[in-house]
Amino acid sequence: PDLDDDYCPTRPGAPCAFLVPAWLGEQETKAQMHLYQLGLLALSLNRTLVLPNVAKSRLSCCYHNPFSFYYAADALDQLGVRTISQAEFVEWSEKRDPAPSAQVVSMVGAKATYLAGAIEIDSASDPTLVPNKPTRNLCLKAPKTRLDFSGHSPLAIYPPEGYHRSEAGRLGFGESVVNTLSSPEVGGKSSRASASRDAPYELPNVLAFNYELRFPIMAPSVVSLVLPSVPPPLPFAHFPYSPVWTDLASNVAASLSPFIAIHWRTETLAPPNLAPCASSLLRKLSLLKSRYPSIKNVYLATDYPIEDPSGIAHSGTFAKVVTEQHHQAFRAFLKSFEKEAKGLSLTTFAREQGRVVLPDALREALATASAEAGKPVGLGELDAGLMGIVDKAVAMRAEVFLTGFAGVGKEAALGCAKVSSFTSQIIEARQARIGEQSAKEDQVRGELWNDVSRWSVKGPDDD
């Protein structure tokens, strides 16, 4: 292609101006929601979203696996968000002449000193640094890309105190963010292109985001309000996973069917609840076995490293808070399962991956990784985040799904889990599949028998 200012890798009709999610807070399940938020923001600013790379249940420009390693490559496009891959974006930055201009934008939680919200323009520091977080590497500086940050000072945008307590407050803040990033006044003050304040301001080609908000600030209605010419995007839906992971999950589910899948999130669960919850879970399994006699297998997905208690927890954040009570509770659970769960066999993905037929692409990837490491490499060693993805995909396909009761407020003492977006994604997928089943006249093997069942400290009958 002609490598002048008109060279652009976007799809027809998509603008050659970009929003890059350089760093996203939170792990994979919630990071999907945050990426969708930035996709809506990109649309509102008439920009194209760059799909971040992925690894270890995180989404960031700093990782080596492409977005399509976890998800369907067109996951955001299916929702009406215009995207390109990070590889396409980097290639564009290398070929474009002149070098693309860029600006760092940081969005974090409310700040006590800015009760009404605020915009900070850091006109003195290195323009490639994240305001107030100088050690955070966005992985967009040379030689990673040819982006030129020198012409624009970093921006930090803070929401008003309590903005998240109402939908109006959240979306109102979202509209103000769109106005801020479109504002000639803000843009002029953040420009370093000339010492003269009268110099014309040009929007940067690229906005590089450090995004740490926990609550949604954008909705399709905001996009339609600020840019009515753009077709309205669809509401958020969890991204479909790459076919290699859904094929693998289908193979595992077929080998276990009919089976119960359990998601037991113990992170932040009160340690005194662990032992009684484990006992209650065993009673619940016995009840389900009597209700569904054909079930012989139980698939356990948990953040506790049940295969190797001395190993790494399945959740990166949980690894910091695992206690001796966790170890005691799970040792007791495993020992009691063998005695009390008559007719049931307990398994995990770590045990199943050696028993099922692996998709060709995965088998080749594991063979390559094993050759490079000089020893056999499993899925968790290939990428620790894949364990959670496959656990979710398997649980979505189980005939029966079981999770702990999330005790809140006065019922906290009964809790055997905490509210989890991981669990919510499984339940939503199961409800959608059950809805599809109800439209069929004939029942077939592999259909779901419930959307979710729960157990609590007080007993197994709490659905």
Specify the residue positions occupied by each region the protein language model found:
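Short, mixed-charge aromatic SLiMs
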Residues: S57-Y71, I426, W449-D461
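A donor-sugar binding/catalytic signature common to diverse glycosyltransferases
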Residues: L386-E447
